[in-house]
Amino acid sequence: MKITQEEVTHVANLSKLRFSEKETAAFATTLSKIVDMVELLGEVDTTGVAPTTTMADRKTVLRPDVAEEGTDRDRLFKNVPKKDNYYIKVPAILDDGGDA
């Protein structure tokens, strides 16, 4: 399946990313190869092969769901450089958020 440069540009715009025309072409080629490889997996005969759900031979160990007292809020905020009424203030990294 061929991924077009327009599709790469569309997804990049949704992700608020900008690429040069050369980078966009390279991504389109690379993504097309990846999709082709994944499509090949669909052609593999898996008759008689048991489904694999995990590669780890571990059982999930869950702790009891017990309410515990948390850490003191003032102690947590002791080293926070900028705060406002128990909210941590951080620099903005997005302009207006856009309409992704």
Swiss-Prot record:
Annotated InterPro entries: Asp/Glu-ADT_sf_sub_c, GatC
Gene3D superfamilies: Glu-tRNAGln amidotransferase C subunit, N-terminal domain (1.10.20.60)
Protein name (record): Aspartyl/glutamyl-tRNA(Asn/Gln) amidotransferase subunit C
Protein's job: Allows the formation of correctly charged Asn-tRNA(Asn) or Gln-tRNA(Gln) through the transamidation of misacylated Asp-tRNA(Asn) or Glu-tRNA(Gln) in organisms which lack either or both of asparaginyl-tRNA or glutaminyl-tRNA synthetases. The reaction takes place in the presence of glutamine and ATP through an activated phospho-Asp-tRNA(Asn) or phospho-Glu-tRNA(Gln).
Disulfide bonds: none
Quaternary structure, from the entry: Heterotrimer of A, B and C subunits.
EC numbers on record: 6.3.5.-
GO molecular function, one term: glutaminyl-tRNA synthase (glutamine-hydrolyzing) activity
Keyword set includes Isomerase: no
Family: Belongs to the GatC family.
Highest taxon, organism lineage: Bacteria
Origin organism lineage: Bacteria, Bacillati, Bacillota, Bacilli, Lactobacillales
GO annotation terms (biological process): glutaminyl-tRNAGln biosynthesis via transamidation; regulation of translational fidelity; translation
Catalytic activity entry: L-glutamyl-tRNA(Gln) + L-glutamine + ATP + H2O = L-glutaminyl-tRNA(Gln) + L-glutamate + ADP + phosphate + H(+); L-aspartyl-tRNA(Asn) + L-glutamine + ATP + H2O = L-asparaginyl-tRNA(Asn) + L-glutamate + ADP + phosphate + 2 H(+)
Keyword Cell membrane: no
Pfam families for the chain: GatC
Keywords assigned by UniProt, alphabetized: ATP-binding, Ligase, Nucleotide-binding, Protein biosynthesis
